[in-house]
Protein backbone atom coordinates (compact mmCIF):
# COMPACT_ATOMS: atom_id res chain seq x y z
CA UNK A 1 0.00 0.00 0.00
CA UNK A 2 1.51 3.32 -1.06
CA UNK A 3 2.29 6.00 1.49
CA UNK A 4 0.77 8.71 -0.69
CA UNK A 5 -2.67 7.17 0.04
CA UNK A 6 -2.09 7.75 3.76
CA UNK A 7 -0.75 11.26 3.09
CA UNK A 8 -3.90 12.07 1.11
CA UNK A 9 -6.00 10.82 4.03
CA UNK A 10 -4.12 13.16 6.38
CA UNK A 11 -4.76 16.04 3.97
CA UNK A 12 -8.51 15.33 3.79
CA UNK A 13 -8.74 15.01 7.58
CA UNK A 14 -6.97 18.33 8.00
CA UNK A 15 -9.45 20.07 5.70
CA UNK A 16 -12.61 19.16 7.64
CA UNK A 17 -13.69 19.85 11.21
CA UNK A 18 -16.75 17.56 11.03
CA UNK A 19 -16.33 14.51 13.24
CA UNK A 20 -18.70 12.34 11.19
CA UNK A 21 -16.82 13.10 7.98
CA UNK A 22 -13.46 12.39 9.64
CA UNK A 23 -14.81 9.09 11.01
CA UNK A 24 -16.06 8.03 7.58
CA UNK A 25 -12.74 8.98 5.94
CA UNK A 26 -10.74 6.90 8.44
CA UNK A 27 -13.20 3.98 8.22
CA UNK A 28 -13.06 3.91 4.41
CA UNK A 29 -9.26 3.94 4.57
CA UNK A 30 -9.11 1.12 7.14
CA UNK A 31 -11.29 -1.08 4.92
CA UNK A 32 -8.53 -0.99 2.26
CA UNK A 33 -5.67 -1.73 4.66
CA UNK A 34 -4.06 -5.19 4.27
CA UNK A 35 -4.38 -7.39 7.36
CA UNK A 36 -0.63 -7.39 8.04
CA UNK A 37 -0.61 -3.55 8.06
CA UNK A 38 -3.40 -3.18 10.62
CA UNK A 39 -1.02 -3.67 13.54
CA UNK A 40 0.70 -0.34 12.88
CA UNK A 41 -1.48 1.81 10.58
CA UNK A 42 -3.91 2.89 13.35
CA UNK A 43 -0.95 4.48 15.16
CA UNK A 44 0.20 6.27 12.02
CA UNK A 45 -3.35 7.61 11.58
CA UNK A 46 -3.13 9.02 15.12
CA UNK A 47 0.18 10.64 14.19
CA UNK A 48 2.23 8.20 16.27
CA UNK A 49 4.51 5.29 15.46
CA UNK A 50 4.14 3.17 18.60
CA UNK A 51 1.55 2.62 21.34
CA UNK A 52 2.01 4.94 24.32
CA UNK A 53 3.33 2.05 26.45
CA UNK A 54 6.10 1.17 24.00
CA UNK A 55 9.49 2.38 25.28
CA UNK A 56 10.84 3.21 21.83
CA UNK A 57 11.19 6.88 20.86
CA UNK A 58 12.28 8.37 17.56
CA UNK A 59 14.67 10.80 19.27
CA UNK A 60 14.65 13.22 16.33
CA UNK A 61 14.37 16.98 16.84
CA UNK A 62 13.77 19.76 14.33
CA UNK A 63 17.48 20.37 13.61
CA UNK A 64 18.24 16.73 12.79
CA UNK A 65 15.11 16.50 10.63
CA UNK A 66 16.11 19.63 8.68
CA UNK A 67 19.62 18.20 8.14
CA UNK A 68 18.06 15.00 6.74
CA UNK A 69 15.91 17.04 4.34
CA UNK A 70 18.93 19.12 3.33
CA UNK A 71 20.89 15.93 2.62
CA UNK A 72 18.02 14.59 0.50
CA UNK A 73 17.28 17.77 -1.45
CA UNK A 74 20.56 19.63 -1.70
CA UNK A 75 18.88 22.71 -0.20
CA UNK A 76 20.77 24.47 2.59
CA UNK A 77 19.48 23.89 6.15
CA UNK A 78 19.35 27.64 6.84
CA UNK A 79 17.11 28.15 3.82
CA UNK A 80 14.66 25.53 5.12
CA UNK A 81 14.71 27.11 8.60
CA UNK A 82 14.04 30.58 7.16
CA UNK A 83 11.14 29.21 5.12
CA UNK A 84 9.32 28.29 8.36
CA UNK A 85 8.94 32.02 9.12
CA UNK A 86 6.77 32.28 6.00
CA UNK A 87 4.86 28.99 6.21
CA UNK A 88 4.53 28.80 10.00
CA UNK A 89 4.89 25.02 9.71
CA UNK A 90 8.04 22.95 9.34
CA UNK A 91 6.07 20.22 7.55
CA UNK A 92 4.98 22.71 4.87
CA UNK A 93 8.55 24.04 4.56
CA UNK A 94 9.89 20.51 4.11
CA UNK A 95 7.26 19.84 1.43
CA UNK A 96 8.44 22.97 -0.41
CA UNK A 97 12.07 21.87 -0.12
CA UNK A 98 11.24 18.45 -1.58
CA UNK A 99 9.29 20.13 -4.40
CA UNK A 100 12.45 22.13 -5.26
CA UNK A 101 14.68 19.10 -4.83
CA UNK A 102 17.97 19.53 -6.69
CA UNK A 103 18.77 15.85 -6.91
CA UNK A 104 16.73 12.69 -7.26
CA UNK A 105 18.07 9.17 -7.47
CA UNK A 106 17.65 7.24 -10.73
CA UNK A 107 16.71 4.30 -8.53
CA UNK A 108 13.94 6.21 -6.74
CA UNK A 109 10.87 4.13 -5.95
CA UNK A 110 7.40 5.16 -4.72
CA UNK A 111 7.18 5.05 -0.94
CA UNK A 112 5.07 2.34 0.66
CA UNK A 113 3.47 2.68 4.08
CA UNK A 114 5.39 -0.38 5.24
CA UNK A 115 8.73 1.10 4.18
CA UNK A 116 8.02 4.40 5.97
CA UNK A 117 6.94 2.54 9.11
CA UNK A 118 9.92 0.17 9.09
CA UNK A 119 12.31 3.10 8.58
CA UNK A 120 10.80 4.97 11.54
CA UNK A 121 11.14 1.82 13.66
CA UNK A 122 14.80 1.59 12.61
CA UNK A 123 15.27 5.27 13.56
CA UNK A 124 13.80 4.60 17.02
CA UNK A 125 15.91 1.49 17.57
CA UNK A 126 19.19 3.16 16.54
CA UNK A 127 21.08 4.16 19.68
CA UNK A 128 24.63 4.68 20.90
CA UNK A 129 27.67 6.23 19.26
CA UNK A 130 27.03 7.68 15.82
CA UNK A 131 23.28 7.11 16.14
CA UNK A 132 22.34 10.69 15.15
CA UNK A 133 24.16 10.40 11.81
CA UNK A 134 22.53 7.03 11.13
CA UNK A 135 19.06 8.39 11.95
CA UNK A 136 19.68 11.32 9.60
CA UNK A 137 20.67 9.00 6.74
CA UNK A 138 17.62 6.75 7.24
CA UNK A 139 15.31 9.77 7.10
CA UNK A 140 17.17 11.31 4.15
CA UNK A 141 16.58 8.11 2.18
CA UNK A 142 12.84 8.51 2.75
CA UNK A 143 12.85 12.16 1.71
CA UNK A 144 14.82 11.33 -1.46
CA UNK A 145 11.91 9.17 -2.66
CA UNK A 146 9.09 11.24 -1.16
CA UNK A 147 6.57 13.39 -2.99
CA UNK A 148 6.05 16.83 -1.36
CA UNK A 149 2.77 15.82 0.32
CA UNK A 150 4.45 12.66 1.66
CA UNK A 151 7.42 14.63 2.99
CA UNK A 152 5.09 17.00 4.84
CA UNK A 153 3.38 14.21 6.77
CA UNK A 154 6.52 12.13 7.36
CA UNK A 155 7.99 15.25 9.00
CA UNK A 156 4.89 15.77 11.13
CA UNK A 157 4.90 12.13 12.21
CA UNK A 158 8.56 12.36 13.22
CA UNK A 159 7.94 15.54 15.25
CA UNK A 160 4.60 14.37 16.68
CA UNK A 161 2.72 17.37 15.23
CA UNK A 162 0.12 15.73 12.96
CA UNK A 163 -2.82 18.18 13.47
CA UNK A 164 -5.51 16.06 11.78
CA UNK A 165 -7.89 16.06 14.74
CA UNK A 166 -8.01 12.27 15.04
CA UNK A 167 -8.22 11.19 18.67
CA UNK A 168 -8.82 7.83 20.34
CA UNK A 169 -12.62 8.19 20.33
CA UNK A 170 -12.75 8.91 16.61
CA UNK A 171 -10.42 6.00 15.78
CA UNK A 172 -12.57 3.69 17.93
CA UNK A 173 -15.70 4.73 16.00
CA UNK A 174 -13.90 4.36 12.66
CA UNK A 175 -12.82 0.78 13.48
CA UNK A 176 -16.42 -0.03 14.42
CA UNK A 177 -17.71 1.45 11.14
CA UNK A 178 -15.00 -0.07 8.93
CA UNK A 179 -15.47 -3.64 10.11
CA UNK A 180 -19.16 -3.50 11.09
CA UNK A 181 -18.54 -4.37 14.74
CA UNK A 182 -20.11 -3.01 17.93
CA UNK A 183 -18.47 0.19 19.11
CA UNK A 184 -18.77 -0.89 22.76
CA UNK A 185 -16.78 -4.06 21.99
CA UNK A 186 -14.05 -2.02 20.27
CA UNK A 187 -13.98 0.29 23.32
CA UNK A 188 -13.79 -2.63 25.76
CA UNK A 189 -11.00 -4.38 23.83
CA UNK A 190 -9.00 -1.16 23.66
CA UNK A 191 -9.48 -0.41 27.37
CA UNK A 192 -8.18 -3.90 28.20
CA UNK A 193 -5.13 -3.83 25.90
CA UNK A 194 -4.37 -0.16 25.07
CA UNK A 195 -3.47 -1.45 21.59
CA UNK A 196 -5.47 -0.12 18.63
CA UNK A 197 -3.39 -2.15 16.17
CA UNK A 198 -4.32 -5.40 17.90
CA UNK A 199 -7.97 -4.33 18.26
CA UNK A 200 -8.31 -3.32 14.58
CA UNK A 201 -6.86 -6.64 13.42
CA UNK A 202 -9.24 -8.64 15.65
CA UNK A 203 -12.19 -6.51 14.47
CA UNK A 204 -11.37 -7.26 10.82
CA UNK A 205 -10.50 -10.96 11.15
CA UNK A 206 -12.77 -12.18 13.96
CA UNK A 207 -15.54 -9.58 14.25
CA UNK A 208 -17.73 -9.15 17.31
CA UNK A 209 -17.03 -12.67 18.61
CA UNK A 210 -13.28 -12.08 18.57
CA UNK A 211 -13.56 -8.68 20.27
CA UNK A 212 -15.80 -10.13 22.99
CA UNK A 213 -13.09 -12.70 23.80
CA UNK A 214 -10.31 -10.11 24.20
CA UNK A 215 -8.90 -10.17 27.70
CA UNK A 216 -6.04 -8.75 29.74
CA UNK A 217 -2.52 -9.45 28.46
CA UNK A 218 0.60 -9.07 30.57
CA UNK A 219 2.79 -6.46 28.90
CA UNK A 220 -0.14 -4.41 27.59
CA UNK A 221 -1.36 -1.96 30.24
CA UNK A 222 -5.05 -1.61 31.06
CA UNK A 223 -6.65 1.83 31.00
CA UNK A 224 -7.03 2.78 34.68
CA UNK A 225 -10.42 3.05 36.40
CA UNK A 226 -10.94 6.62 37.61
CA UNK A 227 -12.83 8.37 40.41
CA UNK A 228 -15.11 11.35 40.80
CA UNK A 229 -14.97 13.69 43.81
CA UNK A 230 -17.47 13.67 46.67
CA UNK A 231 -18.28 16.76 48.72
CA UNK A 232 -17.70 14.94 52.02
CA UNK A 233 -17.66 11.58 53.83
CA UNK A 234 -21.43 11.56 54.33
CA UNK A 235 -22.12 12.04 50.62
CA UNK A 236 -19.61 9.30 49.73
CA UNK A 237 -21.21 6.79 52.10
CA UNK A 238 -24.66 7.62 50.77
CA UNK A 239 -23.46 7.11 47.19
CA UNK A 240 -21.90 3.75 48.16
CA UNK A 241 -25.16 2.43 49.61
CA UNK A 242 -24.37 3.04 53.29
CA UNK A 243 -21.11 1.06 53.57
CA UNK A 244 -17.78 1.58 51.86
CA UNK A 245 -14.10 0.79 51.88
CA UNK A 246 -12.09 3.92 52.63
CA UNK A 247 -8.42 4.02 51.61
CA UNK A 248 -5.76 6.62 52.17
CA UNK A 249 -5.42 8.77 49.05
CA UNK A 250 -1.68 9.15 48.61
CA UNK A 251 -0.14 12.20 46.91
CA UNK A 252 1.91 10.20 44.47
CA UNK A 253 1.94 8.81 40.95
CA UNK A 254 -0.38 5.97 40.07
CA UNK A 255 1.32 2.96 38.51
CA UNK A 256 0.33 -0.40 37.06
CA UNK A 257 2.72 -3.28 37.70
CA UNK A 258 2.95 -6.29 35.37
CA UNK A 259 4.88 -9.28 36.71
CA UNK A 260 5.73 -12.16 34.38
CA UNK A 261 8.09 -14.48 36.22
CA UNK A 262 11.29 -12.54 36.88
CA UNK A 263 10.29 -9.81 34.43
CA UNK A 264 8.61 -6.79 36.03
CA UNK A 265 7.27 -3.89 33.96
CA UNK A 266 5.88 -0.73 35.53
CA UNK A 267 3.61 1.70 33.68
CA UNK A 268 2.68 5.24 34.69
CA UNK A 269 -0.88 6.57 34.76
CA UNK A 270 -0.27 7.69 31.18
CA UNK A 271 0.73 4.07 30.44
CA UNK A 272 4.36 4.99 29.75
CA UNK A 273 6.96 2.38 30.64
CA UNK A 274 8.89 3.79 33.63
CA UNK A 275 10.55 0.52 34.72
CA UNK A 276 14.16 1.60 34.15
CA UNK A 277 13.79 4.73 36.27
CA UNK A 278 12.79 2.87 39.45
CA UNK A 279 14.95 -0.29 39.75
CA UNK A 280 14.59 -0.53 43.54
CA UNK A 281 10.80 -0.84 43.17
CA UNK A 282 11.26 -3.53 40.51
CA UNK A 283 13.39 -5.60 42.92
CA UNK A 284 10.98 -4.99 45.80
CA UNK A 285 8.05 -6.17 43.64
CA UNK A 286 9.86 -9.42 42.82
CA UNK A 287 10.12 -10.10 46.56
CA UNK A 288 6.64 -8.89 47.52
CA UNK A 289 4.42 -10.38 44.79
CA UNK A 290 4.01 -14.13 45.32
CA UNK A 291 2.32 -15.22 42.04
CA UNK A 292 4.43 -15.96 38.96
CA UNK A 293 2.16 -13.75 36.88
CA UNK A 294 0.18 -10.78 38.17
CA UNK A 295 -1.06 -7.26 37.41
CA UNK A 296 -1.48 -4.94 40.38
CA UNK A 297 -2.08 -1.22 40.82
CA UNK A 298 -0.74 1.19 43.38
CA UNK A 299 0.43 4.68 44.20
CA UNK A 300 4.15 5.43 44.11
CA UNK A 301 5.03 7.97 46.80
CA UNK A 302 8.26 9.89 47.40
CA UNK A 303 9.31 9.91 51.06
CA UNK A 304 11.10 12.82 52.74
CA UNK A 305 13.84 12.62 55.38
CA UNK A 306 11.18 13.04 58.08
CA UNK A 307 9.32 9.98 56.79
CA UNK A 308 6.42 12.07 55.51
CA UNK A 309 5.25 12.01 51.88
CA UNK A 310 6.69 14.53 49.42
CA UNK A 311 4.56 16.12 46.64
CA UNK A 312 3.96 13.89 43.61
CA UNK A 313 6.27 16.04 41.44
CA UNK A 314 9.20 14.33 43.19
CA UNK A 315 8.03 10.98 41.78
CA UNK A 316 7.85 12.54 38.31
CA UNK A 317 11.46 13.66 38.72
CA UNK A 318 12.36 10.00 39.27
CA UNK A 319 10.39 8.98 36.16
CA UNK A 320 12.23 11.53 34.01
CA UNK A 321 15.73 10.56 35.14
CA UNK A 322 17.60 8.46 32.57
CA UNK A 323 21.11 8.76 34.01
CA UNK A 324 22.59 8.65 37.53
CA UNK A 325 19.56 6.70 38.69
CA UNK A 326 21.34 5.35 41.79
CA UNK A 327 22.03 8.91 42.91
CA UNK A 328 18.33 9.75 42.53
CA UNK A 329 17.39 6.63 44.49
CA UNK A 330 19.31 8.11 47.43
CA UNK A 331 17.90 11.62 47.00
CA UNK A 332 14.27 10.63 46.40
CA UNK A 333 13.40 7.28 48.00
CA UNK A 334 10.11 5.75 46.85
CA UNK A 335 7.44 3.58 48.41
CA UNK A 336 4.70 1.70 46.54
CA UNK A 337 1.26 1.41 48.16
CA UNK A 338 -0.77 -1.25 46.34
CA UNK A 339 -4.57 -0.93 46.26
CA UNK A 340 -5.88 -3.32 43.58
CA UNK A 341 -5.18 -6.55 41.72
CA UNK A 342 -6.48 -7.12 38.19
CA UNK A 343 -4.92 -10.40 37.12
CA UNK A 344 -3.32 -13.43 38.77
CA UNK A 345 -1.77 -16.47 37.06
CA UNK A 346 -3.90 -16.46 33.92
CA UNK A 347 -7.14 -15.29 35.56
CA UNK A 348 -8.61 -11.83 34.96
CA UNK A 349 -10.16 -10.32 38.09
CA UNK A 350 -11.70 -7.18 36.61
CA UNK A 351 -15.23 -8.63 36.77
CA UNK A 352 -14.68 -9.67 40.39
CA UNK A 353 -16.20 -7.53 43.19
CA UNK A 354 -13.83 -5.03 44.75
CA UNK A 355 -13.75 -6.62 48.23
CA UNK A 356 -12.82 -9.99 46.74
CA UNK A 357 -10.02 -8.31 44.79
CA UNK A 358 -8.84 -6.59 47.98
CA UNK A 359 -8.75 -9.93 49.84
CA UNK A 360 -6.83 -11.48 46.94
CA UNK A 361 -4.36 -8.58 47.04
CA UNK A 362 -3.73 -9.19 50.74
CA UNK A 363 -3.16 -12.89 50.03
CA UNK A 364 -0.62 -12.40 47.25
CA UNK A 365 1.45 -9.53 48.67
CA UNK A 366 4.12 -9.96 51.30
CA UNK A 367 4.81 -6.37 52.33
CA UNK A 368 8.41 -5.17 52.63
CA UNK A 369 10.11 -1.82 53.17
CA UNK A 370 9.35 -0.62 49.64
CA UNK A 371 6.05 -2.33 48.81
CA UNK A 372 3.01 -2.07 51.08
CA UNK A 373 -0.74 -2.45 50.86
CA UNK A 374 -2.73 0.78 51.06
CA UNK A 375 -4.16 1.36 54.54
CA UNK A 376 -7.93 1.01 54.58
CA UNK A 377 -11.10 1.02 56.69
CA UNK A 378 -14.44 -0.65 55.94
CA UNK A 379 -17.28 1.07 57.75
CA UNK A 380 -20.89 2.25 57.75
CA UNK A 381 -20.12 4.87 60.38
CA UNK A 382 -19.64 8.51 59.31
CA UNK A 383 -17.76 9.47 62.51
CA UNK A 384 -15.37 6.52 62.19
CA UNK A 385 -14.63 7.44 58.56
CA UNK A 386 -14.19 11.11 59.57
CA UNK A 387 -11.54 10.10 62.13
CA UNK A 388 -9.71 8.04 59.49
CA UNK A 389 -9.90 11.02 57.10
CA UNK A 390 -8.49 13.36 59.74
CA UNK A 391 -5.60 10.97 60.44
CA UNK A 392 -4.79 10.65 56.72
CA UNK A 393 -4.54 14.44 56.41
CA UNK A 394 -2.39 14.70 59.56
CA UNK A 395 0.01 12.14 58.05
CA UNK A 396 0.46 14.44 55.03
CA UNK A 397 -1.74 12.55 52.57
CA UNK A 398 -4.27 14.06 50.14
CA UNK A 399 -7.41 12.61 51.69
CA UNK A 400 -9.37 9.39 51.22
CA UNK A 401 -10.74 7.20 48.45
CA UNK A 402 -14.17 5.64 48.99
CA UNK A 403 -14.88 2.44 47.06
CA UNK A 404 -18.09 0.53 46.59
CA UNK A 405 -17.64 -2.97 48.03
CA UNK A 406 -19.34 -4.76 45.13
CA UNK A 407 -17.79 -2.66 42.33
CA UNK A 408 -16.18 -4.45 39.43
CA UNK A 409 -13.13 -2.84 37.81
CA UNK A 410 -14.19 -0.64 34.87
CA UNK A 411 -11.11 0.24 32.76
CA UNK A 412 -11.04 3.85 31.58
CA UNK A 413 -14.31 4.76 33.31
CA UNK A 414 -14.68 7.70 35.70
CA UNK A 415 -17.83 6.71 37.58
CA UNK A 416 -19.23 7.01 41.09
CA UNK A 417 -18.13 3.57 42.28
CA UNK A 418 -14.87 5.18 43.37
CA UNK A 419 -14.97 8.62 44.98
CA UNK A 420 -12.25 10.98 46.22
CA UNK A 421 -12.69 12.97 49.41
CA UNK A 422 -10.34 15.95 49.72
CA UNK A 423 -10.43 19.11 51.83
CA UNK A 424 -10.39 21.39 48.78
CA UNK A 425 -11.87 21.41 45.31
CA UNK A 426 -10.00 19.15 42.91
CA UNK A 427 -7.31 20.85 40.84
CA UNK A 428 -7.76 20.55 37.08
CA UNK A 429 -5.38 19.08 34.51
CA UNK A 430 -5.86 21.11 31.33
CA UNK A 431 -4.16 21.38 27.95
CA UNK A 432 -2.39 24.50 26.72
CA UNK A 433 -4.10 25.36 23.40
CA UNK A 434 -2.80 28.90 22.96
CA UNK A 435 -0.71 31.62 24.58
CA UNK A 436 0.13 35.31 24.53
CA UNK A 437 3.58 36.88 24.36
CA UNK A 438 4.61 38.82 27.47
CA UNK A 439 5.36 42.51 27.79
CA UNK A 440 8.43 44.57 28.68
CA UNK A 441 11.36 42.42 29.78
CA UNK A 442 9.20 39.32 29.16
CA UNK A 443 8.30 40.27 25.57
CA UNK A 444 10.41 37.37 24.22
CA UNK A 445 8.62 34.87 26.46
CA UNK A 446 5.13 33.42 26.40
CA UNK A 447 3.53 35.02 29.46
CA UNK A 448 -0.01 33.64 29.72
CA UNK A 449 -1.58 30.44 28.47
CA UNK A 450 -5.01 29.56 27.07
CA UNK A 451 -6.43 26.47 28.77
CA UNK A 452 -8.51 23.80 27.05
CA UNK A 453 -10.64 20.95 28.41
CA UNK A 454 -10.99 17.77 26.36
CA UNK A 455 -14.21 16.86 24.55
CA UNK A 456 -13.95 13.09 23.89
CA UNK A 457 -16.85 13.17 21.44
CA UNK A 458 -15.21 15.57 19.00
CA UNK A 459 -11.55 15.21 19.99
CA UNK A 460 -11.46 19.00 20.44
CA UNK A 461 -10.07 21.04 23.33
CA UNK A 462 -12.52 23.76 24.36
CA UNK A 463 -11.32 26.95 26.02
CA UNK A 464 -12.09 27.41 29.73
CA UNK A 465 -9.85 30.35 30.58
CA UNK A 466 -6.37 31.83 30.60
CA UNK A 467 -3.67 31.39 33.26
CA UNK A 468 -0.79 33.81 33.84
CA UNK A 469 -0.08 33.53 37.56
CA UNK A 470 1.95 30.96 39.47
CA UNK A 471 4.84 30.89 36.98
CA UNK A 472 8.43 31.79 37.85
CA UNK A 473 10.71 33.41 35.25
CA UNK A 474 12.42 30.03 34.85
CA UNK A 475 9.03 28.38 34.25
CA UNK A 476 8.25 30.85 31.46
CA UNK A 477 11.63 30.21 29.82
CA UNK A 478 10.99 26.44 29.92
CA UNK A 479 7.41 26.71 28.66
CA UNK A 480 8.45 29.02 25.81
CA UNK A 481 11.16 26.55 24.77
CA UNK A 482 8.72 23.63 25.04
CA UNK A 483 5.80 25.28 23.23
CA UNK A 484 7.58 27.20 20.46
CA UNK A 485 7.80 24.10 18.16
CA UNK A 486 4.07 23.49 18.74
CA UNK A 487 2.92 26.94 17.56
CA UNK A 488 0.39 26.53 14.74
CA UNK A 489 -0.19 30.20 13.92
CA UNK A 490 0.40 33.70 15.28
CA UNK A 491 -1.79 36.78 15.21
CA UNK A 492 -0.39 39.83 16.97
CA UNK A 493 0.52 38.78 20.52
CA UNK A 494 -1.71 35.69 20.37
CA UNK A 495 -0.43 32.27 19.31
CA UNK A 496 -2.33 29.05 18.71
CA UNK A 497 -0.62 25.93 20.03
CA UNK A 498 -0.99 22.27 19.18
CA UNK A 499 -2.65 20.56 22.19
CA UNK A 500 0.19 18.47 23.60
CA UNK A 501 1.19 19.92 26.98
CA UNK A 502 -0.88 19.30 30.12
CA UNK A 503 -0.63 21.51 33.22
CA UNK A 504 -2.29 21.35 36.61
CA UNK A 505 -4.09 24.49 37.74
CA UNK A 506 -5.90 25.56 40.87
CA UNK A 507 -8.68 28.15 40.77
CA UNK A 508 -11.05 30.07 43.01
CA UNK A 509 -14.18 28.64 41.40
CA UNK A 510 -15.78 27.38 38.21
CA UNK A 511 -18.29 29.75 36.63
CA UNK A 512 -20.84 29.22 33.88
CA UNK A 513 -19.84 31.37 30.92
CA UNK A 514 -21.48 32.13 27.56
CA UNK A 515 -18.12 33.56 26.44
CA UNK A 516 -16.65 30.11 25.75
CA UNK A 517 -18.05 27.21 23.69
CA UNK A 518 -17.30 24.97 26.66
CA UNK A 519 -19.92 26.86 28.69
CA UNK A 520 -17.52 27.24 31.63
CA UNK A 521 -14.76 29.59 32.78
CA UNK A 522 -12.23 29.30 35.60
CA UNK A 523 -12.13 32.25 38.00
CA UNK A 524 -8.55 33.22 39.00
CA UNK A 525 -6.74 30.10 37.71
CA UNK A 526 -3.17 29.63 38.98
CA UNK A 527 -0.44 27.34 37.64
CA UNK A 528 0.56 24.49 39.96
CA UNK A 529 2.65 22.01 37.96
CA UNK A 530 3.54 20.54 34.58
CA UNK A 531 1.81 17.14 34.26
CA UNK A 532 4.36 15.15 32.29
CA UNK A 533 2.62 11.97 33.41
CA UNK A 534 -0.48 12.88 31.36
CA UNK A 535 -1.13 13.15 27.65
CA UNK A 536 -3.72 15.51 26.15
CA UNK A 537 -6.41 12.84 26.12
CA UNK A 538 -5.82 12.25 29.86
CA UNK A 539 -6.70 15.89 30.55
CA UNK A 540 -9.90 16.77 32.37
CA UNK A 541 -12.97 16.74 30.15
CA UNK A 542 -15.83 19.21 29.74
CA UNK A 543 -18.04 16.63 31.47
CA UNK A 544 -15.63 16.51 34.41
CA UNK A 545 -15.70 20.31 34.73
CA UNK A 546 -19.51 20.18 34.71
CA UNK A 547 -19.40 17.57 37.51
CA UNK A 548 -17.01 19.71 39.55
CA UNK A 549 -19.26 22.74 39.01
CA UNK A 550 -22.20 20.77 40.45
CA UNK A 551 -20.03 19.57 43.35
CA UNK A 552 -18.88 23.14 44.01
CA UNK A 553 -22.50 24.34 44.14
CA UNK A 554 -23.42 21.47 46.51
CA UNK A 555 -20.52 22.41 48.79
CA UNK A 556 -21.87 25.98 48.79
CA UNK A 557 -25.30 24.63 49.63
CA UNK A 558 -26.81 25.94 46.40
CA UNK A 559 -27.85 22.58 44.99
UniProtKB/Swiss-Prot annotation:
The active site is at 249 (n6-amp-lysine intermediate). The keyword Transmembrane does not apply. GO terms for biological process: cell division; DNA biosynthetic process; DNA recombination; DNA repair; lagging strand elongation. Its EC number is 6.5.1.1. It holds the Pfam family DNA_ligase_A_N. Keywords: ATP-binding, Cell cycle, Cell division, DNA damage, DNA recombination, DNA repair, DNA replication, Ligase, Magnesium, Metal-binding, Nucleotide-binding. ATP binds at residues 247, 254, 269, 299, 339, 414, 420. One of its GO terms (molecular function) is DNA binding. Its cofactor is Mg(2+). It comes from the Archaea. It catalyses: ATP + (deoxyribonucleotide)n-3'-hydroxyl + 5'-phospho-(deoxyribonucleotide)m = (deoxyribonucleotide)n+m + AMP + diphosphate. DNA ligase that seals nicks in double-stranded DNA during DNA replication, DNA recombination and DNA repair. Belongs to the ATP-dependent DNA ligase family. This is DNA ligase. It comes from Pyrococcus abyssi.
